[in-house]
Amino acid sequence: MTELMTQNSALPVWQSQDHQDDPVIAELRNHFGPDAFSVQPTRTGIPVVWVKREQILKVLTFLKKLPKPYVMLYDLHGVDERLRTHRQGLPAADFTVFYHLISIDRNRDIMLKVALSENDLHLPTCTRIFPNANWYERETWEMFGMTFDGHTHLTRIMMPKSWEGHPLRKDYPARATEFDPFVLTKQKEDLEMEGLTFKPEEWGMKRGKDNEDFMFLNLGPNHPSAHGAFRIILQLDGEEIVDCVPDIGYHHRGAEKMGERQSWHSYIPYTDRVEYLGGCVNEMPYVLAVEKLAGIVVPDRVNVIRVMLSELFRINSHLLYISTYIQDVGGMTPVFLAFTDRQKIYDVVEAITGFRMHPAWFRIGGVAHDLPRGWEGLLREFLDWLPKRLDSYVKVALRNSVLRARAEGVAAYGAKEALDWGVTGAALRATGIDFDVRKWRPYSGYENFNFEVPVGDGVSDCYSRVMLKVEEMRQSLRILEQCLNNMPAGPFKADHPLTTPPPKERTLQHIETLITHFLQVSWGPVMPANESFQMIEATKGINSYYLTSDGSTMSYRTRIRTPSFPHLQQIPSVIRGSLVSDLIVYLGSIDFVMSDVDR
């Protein structure tokens, strides 16, 4: 088990910091020299270092080999800098590629940035250092046009092969009305269908061996065990999986592009739909990141309300996960039982927020309104109901000998492989790594709650992953019990000029507040020019928002890092040599939805 150090800072999280005192800055200076890079002050809460393109692979390798290494490539993506006006003190750049690394031993992050000119968008691939960079580099090339030299398959990943242009560039249209009317001719249809034809040679696969042909089988994109619009092309030798290629993007909606056209306030409903089972959990990292930009400190009551709603949705998501997992293995009854339990959660959520799946209820600086009368009774009823139901799921289904035979030891991997592929959440903790953001990087007051983090015994397989989720639900019940018994008094919104919308009561008395209310609701609040970042422990792993403000009513760049994206990229490395039936159990054990993958 890895010991972690909780991050500490004497400065408020919204103040710009360059983190010059972070030990990694001194280590980089000692190794590469003081002039090898520059440090950017931000409100991200982590060191942000600009590195020369020629040095990026050396720096990445150095960080991964430190005594307390930065072992995980958490994120990699790009920014179109051409229209950004507030760039004082930053290296000249038309485009930027950033690398976000995590050190588990240090419980610290670092972000590396590489400046690129529009005339030369080449930089070397880092897939030999971090294998999970594969998909991130493909998406960055697709969305911005940066070419990662040495990448073995730099092709489109979210968009159809026939798509033209790079959608996240600033000169690319953001609305359908800015395009010509779409007409699907027979010729275009044939072209699209041809683009979906799998050609093994493009992926370095052989069509056969020893005078025998392999079978190539499409699992999905419309298969019940694919859990959404998701295709996996299987290379089969009988029932054995020789290799496979996950094919994603069918659910891509351009969530990050939408963030550039919505105000800071009006983007909140879009966050619910990134991982559509998570509800308020999705809103948490976004509003916290915006509040860092604004310098808002919310009241204690807001923190506890947000935690309460997040844990309700965590249980709701986990219930659907374990019931559909059991269904994938062959047990039907738990699905119907779980929907009864989830209905009780929705009763509580609807009474509090007015909505069920997608509340869009968190606000910049607070929540939409205060808790209603009688919420305590609804929550009390649910807390009394669920523990016995969890016991029955474990006793009747999860300890079933058939299920255990199908799941134990299947699709198993250890801590090193999990970190190499960017795995987070219960799948990572099943390998024995005790890393839960709620504990080690507390947000929204989680440090004030008493709960345990379930951790596995060193191997993450199809059985340990689901059993950890059951224990996580029990811990969420503990947190909810504390919310019920210790709900603070006080306002449900912060008293801050950028709280959106401002407290309604004052608009009836002060003309300045009325004007502010009108402007913030119609145009949106103006956030200070800066960058902020917030990660949380979401239902399926670590989710985060990396926001860039250019001093406007809208985000200049909204980067959404979701846990399901790297989890699906890992599939081939885990399932090679297994049977097709094992793949079905493995897919059920991952816990993903395609909106979380494709955004």
Swiss-Prot record:
Molecular functions (GO terms): NAD binding; NADH dehydrogenase (ubiquinone) activity; NADH:ubiquinone reductase (non-electrogenic) activity; quinone binding
Keyword presence, Iron: no
Catalytic activity: a quinone + NADH + 5 H(+)(in) = a quinol + NAD(+) + 4 H(+)(out)
UniProt membrane topology term: Peripheral membrane protein
This enzyme's EC code(s): 7.1.1.-
Highest taxon above the source species: Bacteria
Region (NADH dehydrogenase I subunit C), start-end ranges: 1-189
Pfam families in UniProt: Complex1_30kDa (PF00329), Complex1_49kDa (PF00346)
Keywords from the UniProt entry: Cell inner membrane, Cell membrane, Membrane, Multifunctional enzyme, NAD, Quinone, Translocase, Transport, Ubiquinone
InterPro entries found in the cross-reference section: NADH_DH_suC, NADH_DH_suCD, NADH_Q_OxRdtase_suD, NADH_quin_OxRdtase_su_C/D-like, NADH_UbQ_OxRdtase_30kDa_su, NADH_UbQ_OxRdtase_49kDa_CS, NDH1_su_D/H, NiFe-Hase_large
Location in or out of the cell: Cell inner membrane
SUPFAM superfamilies assigned to the protein according to its UniProt record, in alphabetical order: HydB/Nqo4-like (SSF56762), Nqo5-like (SSF143243)
Region (NADH dehydrogenase I subunit D): 213-599
SUBUNIT field: NDH-1 is composed of 13 different subunits. Subunits NuoB, CD, E, F, and G constitute the peripheral sector of the complex.
The protein, known as: NADH-quinone oxidoreductase subunit C/D
UniProt source species: Sodalis glossinidius (strain morsitans)
